[in-house]
C-alpha cells in the first residue's frame, strides 16, 4: 500500500479522530476539537524507545508556554492507547514518561501517519514529523526528521510565535526571528527599512 500524503502547507490539515491518553484516561480526540487554536502535532516512532521520551517530556514540560499562545501540543505514534498508558505509568528514571501535560494519540491503523506523509512503510512506524496547524485548521509548517535525531521544542515554539505574529501584523519574519526582533514589511520600498538597518 503506497502512502498518499494529504498534508500540504497552506492547505487545510487532514482531519483526524483518534483515541488519546489525556491526564491518564482514554479520550477520543479530533483535530476539529481545537478549532480556533494553534496545534503542534508531532509524530514519533514508538513507545519505550530512546530518543522519543526526551522529545515527549520536553514538549510536556513546556506545554504551559504553548498554552499561553493558545496552542495545543499533541503527540502521535502507531502504538495503542494501552501502550501509551503503560509508558506514562513507567517512571522517567526507568525510561518511562511519568505524568504528562499533553495528549498522546494512538494511530494503530497508521492512517494518521499516512495522511500526514510520515509513515515509514517498511517498518510500519512514523518518522519524526512536526506540523504547525493554525486556528483555522490550515497547515503552516512541516518538518520531518529521520529516526535518530530529535526535534527542538524551542524551534517549535518560535515557529508558532512567528506565524501568529505574521497573522496579526501582516509583516514577515526573517531568518532566526524571535519575539521582539525586527520584522520586514512585505513590499519593495518598505522592506528597505529592514535591510538598511541589518546590512
From Swiss-Prot:
It catalyses: a hydroperoxide + [thioredoxin]-dithiol = an alcohol + [thioredoxin]-disulfide + H2O. One of its GO terms (cellular component) is cytosol. Gene3D superfamilies: Glutaredoxin. One of its GO terms (biological process) is leukocyte activation. Thiol-specific peroxidase that catalyzes the reduction of hydrogen peroxide and organic hydroperoxides to water and alcohols, respectively. Plays a role in cell protection against oxidative stress by detoxifying peroxides and as sensor of hydrogen peroxide-mediated signaling events. Might participate in the signaling cascades of growth factors and tumor necrosis factor-alpha by regulating the intracellular concentrations of H(2)O(2). The active site is a conserved redox-active cysteine residue, the peroxidatic cysteine (C(P)), which makes the nucleophilic attack on the peroxide substrate. The peroxide oxidizes the C(P)-SH to cysteine sulfenic acid (C(P)-SOH), which then reacts with another cysteine residue, the resolving cysteine (C(R)), to form a disulfide bridge. The disulfide is subsequently reduced by an appropriate electron donor to complete the catalytic cycle. In this typical 2-Cys peroxiredoxin, C(R) is provided by the other dimeric subunit to form an intersubunit disulfide. This is Peroxiredoxin-2. It comes from Bos taurus. The lineage of its organism: Eukaryota, Metazoa, Chordata, Craniata, Vertebrata. The gene is PRDX2.
Amino acid at each position: 500500500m503506497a502512502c498518499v500524503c494529504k498534508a500540504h502547507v497552506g492547505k487545510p490539515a487532514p482531519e483526524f479522530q483518534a483515541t488519546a491518553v489525556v491526564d491518564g484516561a482514554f479520550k477520543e480526540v479530533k483535530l476539529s476539537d481545537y478549532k480556533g487554536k494553534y496545534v503542534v502535532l508531532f509524530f514519533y516512532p514508538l513507545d519505550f524507545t530512546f530518543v522519543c521520551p526526551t522529545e515527549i517530556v520536553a514538549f510536556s514540560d513546556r506545554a504551559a508556554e504553548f498554552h499561553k499562545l493558545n496552542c495545543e501540543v499533541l503527540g502521535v505514534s502507531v502504538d495503542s492507547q494501552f501502550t501509551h498508558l503503560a509508558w506514562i505509568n513507567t517512571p522517567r528514571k526507568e525510561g518511562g514518561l511519568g505524568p504528562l501535560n499533553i495528549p498522546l494519540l494512538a494511530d494503530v491503523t497508521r492512517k494518521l501517519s499516512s495522511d500526514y506523509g510520515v509513515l515509514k512503510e517498511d517498518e510500519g512506524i512514523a518518522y519524526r514529523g512536526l506540523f504547525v496547524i493554525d486556528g483555522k485548521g490550515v497547515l503552516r509548517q512541516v518538518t520531518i526528521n529521520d529516526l535518530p535525531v530529535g526535534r527542538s521544542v524551542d524551534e517549535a515554539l518560535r515557529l508558532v510565535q512567528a506565524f501568529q505574529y505574521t497573522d496579526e501584523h501582516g509583516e514577515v519574519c526573517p531568518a532566526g526571528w524571535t519575539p521582539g526582533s525586527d520584522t520586514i514589511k512585505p513590499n519593495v520600498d518598505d522592506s528597505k527599512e529592514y535591510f538598511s538597518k541589518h546590512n
